[in-house]
């Protein structure tokens, strides 16, 4: 696993666990990491956990004017007209296409304090929510200055990039992330119909180039969430086999190359995850 990641030019902290047993593998699993868009897992879990407790209605419609939307390359972030969507449909966009604008509407309705309370209740002591995605984008733009975001990828750049520093924003660990996923899949994070809805939403991600690339089988289901920001390439999710066994996976990586397009690095995450799951399956 380490050889695969190293040859692809990735530094990684990762953790893989059997959802229903004690078997686990990892390296640097307790190191704090800047989670980028993987943090949307914690956000949508808090939404549906609040729904299960009767404190929020995910079917409630929200008016979404164009002004004030957070920047991004997908979903509402690139739409040019006003819209009206429910909170659960916004959650679907936040997971399926990593829509930053949709996620920030959820932050506004669920609340940063509520997400932090949720992860504390679930025992995730090293996970902290500290900023909306619009604030994250603004910090990148401020750090880049006139050179633009591309300047931040230059290995020789002396600029401190706050978005890459776990202490500056949303953060977690690989072990906390797999713990969250295991609790979600066991129905411990959110029970009942809203727990089923949470599982449905987390199975909607469209990207297949990282975690899912390591499991190209029609009878193996992969649910996940990517995170991409400058040199960061993350993915976390659950791999479910037809024999009923299931595995929570979290890979937080940083590329050594400044290139934005690195398909070999992306696929290495899937390959390493497959090797880890195969080892747990014996």
What is each model feature region?
Residues 8-11, 107-181, 185:
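Mid-domain, small-residue-enriched loop/turn segments at the edges of structured enzyme/sensor domains
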């Amino acid at each position: 696993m380490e050889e695969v990641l190293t040859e692809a030019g990735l530094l990684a902290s990762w953790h893989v666990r059997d959802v229903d047993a004690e078997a686990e593998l990892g390296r640097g699993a307790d190191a704090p990491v800047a989670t980028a868009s993987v943090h949307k897992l914690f956000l949508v879990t808090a939404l549906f956990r609040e729904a299960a407790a009767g404190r929020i209605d995910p079917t409630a419609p929200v008016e979404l004017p164009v002004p004030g939307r957070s920047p991004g390359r997908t979903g509402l972030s690139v739409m040019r007209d006003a819209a009206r969507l429910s909170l659960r449909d916004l959650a679907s966009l936040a997971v399926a296409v990593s829509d930053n604008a949709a996620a920030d509407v959820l932050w506004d309705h669920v609340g940063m304090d509520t997400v932090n309370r949720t992860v504390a209740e679930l025992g995730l002591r090293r996970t902290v929510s500290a900023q909306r995605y619009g604030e994250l984008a603004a910090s990148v733009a401020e750090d880049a200055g006139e050179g633009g975001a591309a300047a931040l990828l230059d290995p020789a750049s002396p600029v401190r990039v706050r978005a890459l520093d776990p202490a500056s924003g949303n953060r977690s660990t690989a072990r906390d992330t797999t713990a969250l996923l295991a609790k979600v899949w066991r129905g411990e994070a959110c029970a009942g119909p809203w727990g089923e809805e949470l599982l449905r939403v987390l199975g909607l991600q469209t990207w297949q180039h990282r975690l899912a690339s390591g499991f190209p089988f029609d009878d193996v289901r992969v649910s996940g969430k990517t995170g991409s920001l400058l040199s960061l390439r993350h993915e976390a999710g659950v791999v479910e086999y037809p024999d009923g066994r299931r595995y929570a996976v979290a890979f937080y990586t940083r590329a050594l190359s400044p290139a934005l397009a690195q398909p070999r690095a992306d696929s290495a995450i899937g390959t390493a995850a497959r090797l880890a799951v195969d080892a747990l399956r014996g």
